[in-house]
């Protein structure tokens, strides 16, 4: 005799109403679109903060971990296309894992921004290692610049003041070898290289109109207008740019986490009622 009982609503089953079949066919694309809408903007914000040219110096590159989120979304999409029905583990993984990754990174960036904005604004040059190291690097650059100005003043007869108005550290003959620690032939000339520190300090002077590091001082690389110490400028970027954007990521992900939990609780009984294994 004919078997009675709930029929599993598998896509393509001729016994099922067209609406239900269409809903199942649409599910993989709809779920993937929800994931893209939820996670694409926070992912972009985290990457933008991490790659910011001012923040980069103090930031580890762990933020690139967020690039695994599109991979998770694609894998979950492929599972749903292959199975033809919502798969509980895939749904939970596709919604919760990217959320936690972004929440963690947003939180780390927020706490880092609060810490750095305070310590960089402080007049204490020793508030943390990175700040102290950059001050030493700036002092090394100033020493080179000062010697260079003195030597040029002796050779040309021009006053130090006039030379300091027009002459910049990169105009000094020995600048490149001290910067890289290498001679023109590529042999080691100095014990250390200043490439990372001096490139960063030069970028700040040329693009953020500052001079000196811990305190406002002689501009070494740029001739543009300047009014603040570069550490104050970086502190402001952490406070006015990094902190609010990182906070935004955290708020978005906490809201999404709550909405996801509610959806999963409500979705279970509905899917089971339609004969799906959930």
Where are the model-predicted features located?
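Membrane-proximal loop-to-helix boundary features in eukaryotic membrane proteins
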Residues: 1-159, 164-168, 175-178, 183-278
């Amino acid at each position: 005799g004919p078997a009675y009982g709930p029929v599993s609503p598998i896509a393509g089953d001729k016994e099922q109403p067209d609406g239900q079949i269409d809903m199942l066919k649409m599910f993989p694309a709809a779920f993937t679109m929800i994931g893209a809408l939820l996670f694409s903007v926070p992912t972009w914000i985290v990457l933008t903060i991490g790659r910011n040219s001012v923040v980069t110096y103090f930031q580890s590159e762990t933020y690139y971990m967020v690039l695994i989120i599109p991979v998770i979304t694609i894998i979950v999409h492929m599972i749903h296309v292959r199975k033809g029905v919502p798969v509980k583990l895939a749904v939970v993984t596709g919604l919760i894992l990217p959320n936690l990754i972004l929440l963690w990174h947003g939180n780390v960036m927020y706490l880092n921004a609060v810490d750095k904005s305070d310590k960089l604004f402080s007049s204490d040059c020793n508030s943390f290692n990175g700040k102290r190291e950059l001050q030493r690097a700036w002092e090394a650059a100033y020493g080179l610049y000062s010697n260079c100005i003195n030597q040029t003043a002796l050779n040309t007869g021009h006053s130090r003041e006039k030379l300091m108005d027009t002459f910049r550290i990169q105009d000094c003959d020995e600048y490149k070898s001290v910067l890289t620690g290498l001679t023109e032939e590529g042999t080691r000339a100095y014990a250390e290289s200043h490439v990372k520190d001096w490139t960063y300090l030069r970028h700040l002077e040329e693009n953020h109109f500052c001079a000196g590091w811990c305190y406002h001082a002689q501009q070494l690389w740029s001739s543009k207008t300047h009014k603040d110490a570069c550490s104050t400028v970086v502190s402001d970027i952490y406070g006015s740019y990094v902190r609010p954007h990182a906070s935004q990521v955290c708020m978005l992900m906490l809201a999404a986490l709550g909405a996801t939990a509610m959806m999963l609780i409500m979705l279970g009984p509905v899917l089971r009622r339609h004969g799906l294994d959930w």
